[in-house]
Protein backbone atom coordinates (compact mmCIF):
# COMPACT_ATOMS: atom_id res chain seq x y z
CA UNK A 1 0.00 0.00 0.00
CA UNK A 2 0.95 3.66 -0.38
CA UNK A 3 0.19 5.95 2.54
CA UNK A 4 0.12 9.70 2.77
CA UNK A 5 2.29 10.87 5.65
CA UNK A 6 0.18 13.54 7.26
CA UNK A 7 1.89 16.78 8.26
CA UNK A 8 -1.18 17.63 10.34
CA UNK A 9 -1.63 18.15 14.05
CA UNK A 10 -4.97 17.30 15.65
CA UNK A 11 -4.51 20.19 18.10
CA UNK A 12 -4.91 22.53 15.12
CA UNK A 13 -8.42 23.19 13.89
CA UNK A 14 -9.77 23.41 10.37
CA UNK A 15 -12.86 25.48 9.70
CA UNK A 16 -14.95 25.12 6.57
CA UNK A 17 -18.29 26.50 5.50
CA UNK A 18 -20.55 23.58 4.64
CA UNK A 19 -23.05 24.70 1.98
CA UNK A 20 -25.89 23.06 3.91
CA UNK A 21 -24.86 22.77 7.56
CA UNK A 22 -22.98 26.07 7.86
CA UNK A 23 -19.67 26.66 9.62
CA UNK A 24 -18.00 23.47 10.88
CA UNK A 25 -14.83 23.31 12.96
CA UNK A 26 -12.90 20.05 13.30
CA UNK A 27 -9.44 18.87 14.34
CA UNK A 28 -6.89 18.90 11.52
CA UNK A 29 -6.08 15.44 10.16
CA UNK A 30 -2.93 13.97 11.71
CA UNK A 31 -3.51 10.39 10.57
CA UNK A 32 -1.32 8.76 7.90
CA UNK A 33 -3.82 7.18 5.54
CA UNK A 34 -3.79 4.80 2.59
CA UNK A 35 -4.13 6.47 -0.82
CA UNK A 36 -3.27 3.42 -2.99
CA UNK A 37 -4.28 -0.10 -2.00
CA UNK A 38 -1.93 -3.07 -2.45
CA UNK A 39 -3.65 -3.95 -5.74
CA UNK A 40 -2.82 -0.47 -7.08
CA UNK A 41 -6.41 0.77 -6.88
CA UNK A 42 -6.73 4.27 -5.38
CA UNK A 43 -8.82 4.71 -2.26
CA UNK A 44 -11.91 6.90 -2.33
CA UNK A 45 -9.98 9.73 -0.64
CA UNK A 46 -7.27 9.87 -3.31
CA UNK A 47 -9.66 9.28 -6.23
CA UNK A 48 -11.94 12.03 -4.91
CA UNK A 49 -9.13 14.59 -4.88
CA UNK A 50 -7.61 13.69 -8.26
CA UNK A 51 -10.87 13.11 -10.15
CA UNK A 52 -12.59 16.21 -8.79
CA UNK A 53 -9.52 18.32 -9.61
CA UNK A 54 -9.36 16.98 -13.18
CA UNK A 55 -13.11 17.43 -13.62
CA UNK A 56 -12.87 20.99 -12.24
CA UNK A 57 -15.48 20.16 -9.61
CA UNK A 58 -16.41 23.23 -7.59
CA UNK A 59 -18.99 21.74 -5.18
CA UNK A 60 -19.09 18.30 -3.59
CA UNK A 61 -22.53 17.31 -2.26
CA UNK A 62 -22.70 14.00 -0.43
CA UNK A 63 -24.18 12.26 2.57
CA UNK A 64 -23.36 13.60 6.00
CA UNK A 65 -21.60 10.34 6.89
CA UNK A 66 -18.63 11.85 4.98
CA UNK A 67 -18.24 14.93 7.21
CA UNK A 68 -15.57 13.20 9.30
CA UNK A 69 -13.44 12.77 6.14
CA UNK A 70 -13.35 16.47 5.25
CA UNK A 71 -10.11 17.15 7.18
CA UNK A 72 -8.37 14.39 5.17
CA UNK A 73 -9.82 15.67 1.91
CA UNK A 74 -8.89 19.31 2.52
CA UNK A 75 -5.38 18.24 3.52
CA UNK A 76 -5.01 16.06 0.43
CA UNK A 77 -6.24 18.78 -1.94
CA UNK A 78 -3.82 21.29 -0.42
CA UNK A 79 -0.84 18.91 -0.46
CA UNK A 80 -1.50 18.13 -4.13
CA UNK A 81 -1.73 21.84 -4.91
CA UNK A 82 -5.39 21.58 -5.94
CA UNK A 83 -8.12 24.11 -5.26
CA UNK A 84 -10.33 22.84 -2.43
CA UNK A 85 -13.98 22.48 -3.54
CA UNK A 86 -16.91 23.67 -1.47
CA UNK A 87 -18.53 20.87 0.52
CA UNK A 88 -22.18 20.30 1.34
CA UNK A 89 -23.36 17.39 3.45
CA UNK A 90 -26.90 16.14 3.10
CA UNK A 91 -28.72 14.34 5.89
CA UNK A 92 -30.12 10.98 4.84
CA UNK A 93 -33.78 10.47 4.07
CA UNK A 94 -35.25 8.43 6.90
CA UNK A 95 -37.97 5.80 6.98
CA UNK A 96 -40.06 4.43 9.84
CA UNK A 97 -39.66 0.71 10.36
CA UNK A 98 -41.13 -1.10 13.35
CA UNK A 99 -41.51 2.22 15.17
CA UNK A 100 -37.88 3.28 14.69
CA UNK A 101 -36.26 5.57 12.13
CA UNK A 102 -33.62 4.21 9.80
CA UNK A 103 -31.77 5.53 6.77
CA UNK A 104 -33.63 4.68 3.58
CA UNK A 105 -31.64 2.24 1.44
CA UNK A 106 -31.44 1.92 -2.32
CA UNK A 107 -30.88 -1.83 -1.84
CA UNK A 108 -33.73 -2.51 0.60
CA UNK A 109 -36.37 0.04 -0.34
CA UNK A 110 -38.04 -0.16 -3.75
CA UNK A 111 -39.54 3.33 -3.31
CA UNK A 112 -36.11 4.83 -4.02
CA UNK A 113 -36.36 3.76 -7.66
CA UNK A 114 -38.41 5.61 -10.26
CA UNK A 115 -39.76 2.32 -11.61
CA UNK A 116 -41.65 1.87 -8.34
CA UNK A 117 -43.58 5.11 -8.89
CA UNK A 118 -44.23 4.35 -12.55
CA UNK A 119 -45.68 0.96 -11.61
CA UNK A 120 -47.85 2.62 -8.93
CA UNK A 121 -49.21 5.11 -11.49
CA UNK A 122 -47.52 8.27 -10.21
CA UNK A 123 -46.80 10.93 -12.81
CA UNK A 124 -43.12 11.94 -13.06
CA UNK A 125 -44.09 15.56 -12.38
CA UNK A 126 -45.79 14.56 -9.11
CA UNK A 127 -42.71 12.66 -7.94
CA UNK A 128 -40.50 15.64 -8.79
CA UNK A 129 -42.80 18.04 -6.92
CA UNK A 130 -42.72 15.77 -3.86
CA UNK A 131 -38.93 15.54 -3.94
CA UNK A 132 -38.67 19.32 -4.10
CA UNK A 133 -40.78 19.63 -0.93
CA UNK A 134 -38.40 17.20 0.80
CA UNK A 135 -35.24 18.92 -0.49
CA UNK A 136 -35.96 22.64 -0.21
CA UNK A 137 -37.78 24.10 2.78
CA UNK A 138 -39.32 26.99 0.85
CA UNK A 139 -40.62 25.04 -2.15
CA UNK A 140 -44.08 24.36 -0.74
CA UNK A 141 -44.63 28.05 0.01
CA UNK A 142 -43.37 28.98 -3.47
CA UNK A 143 -45.73 26.44 -5.09
CA UNK A 144 -48.70 27.84 -3.13
CA UNK A 145 -47.86 31.34 -4.41
CA UNK A 146 -47.12 30.15 -7.97
CA UNK A 147 -49.56 27.30 -8.71
CA UNK A 148 -49.35 27.68 -12.48
CA UNK A 149 -45.62 28.36 -12.82
CA UNK A 150 -43.31 25.72 -14.25
CA UNK A 151 -41.11 24.09 -11.63
CA UNK A 152 -38.04 25.41 -13.48
CA UNK A 153 -38.97 28.90 -12.25
CA UNK A 154 -38.28 27.85 -8.66
CA UNK A 155 -34.87 29.01 -7.41
CA UNK A 156 -33.35 26.00 -5.68
CA UNK A 157 -30.77 26.89 -3.03
CA UNK A 158 -28.53 24.68 -0.93
CA UNK A 159 -29.01 27.02 2.02
CA UNK A 160 -32.71 26.07 2.19
CA UNK A 161 -31.99 22.35 2.48
CA UNK A 162 -32.76 20.76 5.82
CA UNK A 163 -29.99 20.04 8.34
CA UNK A 164 -31.81 16.93 9.50
CA UNK A 165 -33.02 13.92 7.57
CA UNK A 166 -36.49 14.13 6.11
CA UNK A 167 -38.90 11.37 7.05
CA UNK A 168 -40.09 9.60 3.92
CA UNK A 169 -43.70 8.56 4.33
CA UNK A 170 -45.07 6.41 1.57
CA UNK A 171 -48.78 5.78 1.43
Where do the model's predicted regions map?
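Active-site cores that bind ATP or allylic diphosphates and position pyrophosphate for catalysis
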Residues: 1-107, 111-115
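Catalytic adenosine-cofactor/nucleotide-binding cores of aminoacyl-tRNA synthetases and other
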Residues: 68, 80-171
Amino acid sequence: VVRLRSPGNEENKIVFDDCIKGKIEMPENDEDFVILKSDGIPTYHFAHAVDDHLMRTTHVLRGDEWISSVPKHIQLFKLLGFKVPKYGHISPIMKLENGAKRKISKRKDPELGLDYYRSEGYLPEAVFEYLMTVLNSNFEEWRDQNPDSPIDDFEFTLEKMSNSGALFDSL
